[in-house]
């Protein structure tokens, strides 16, 4: 775990600032007595800064608390970086199966069981408009009628707008032809009081994005993450 330290504001403070930071990092084992960064730590940070493929994670709780995550993958393996306020943790992981990625993707959630409801799909732009209208004061129940949500899914949708929910938005990216390229849409996992919901995008034949809402079983989350990143 490392702290994000504000830089010095005056050149006269530089020597004192550097001495204190080196002392702290040496005490933590990040640097050795000769002033060199531990090779493992250096490799983790290099992979996070220059990954071949990655997943960006944004966790949000009902009270507005936020955690950021970054899953970096490359020839050197997989490193997970999590940031909360001014603290960042780096963890090297062996993820050799899609379901092994699920605990990483949902680490900031409340660990709800999969919700039970009839799966349904909506055009992504329609769902975004409904979400905006609800945030601007429209009735959730009126939106359910407008969108034609199945009866079994209505309690889940209502709970998804409750203040007790927590969710993660996942966006994938990769280095391609020398450029960093991120996906246009993301996968979401939402923990509500009635269970976990998976929202995954697919492109329709006309090129429009469609969001599918399904129970958040670990296998489903893993499958969505794999299909989304390939």
Q: Where is each model-derived feature located?
A:
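Hydrophobic protein-protein interaction segments
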Residues: 132-202
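Surface-exposed beta-loop interaction hotspot
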Residues: 82-145
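Conserved small/polar residues in nucleotide/adenosyl-binding loops
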Residues: 229-230
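Accessory beta->alpha helical hairpin/"wing" motif in late/C-terminal subdomains of nucleic-acid enzymes
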Residues: 32-77, 86-98, 102
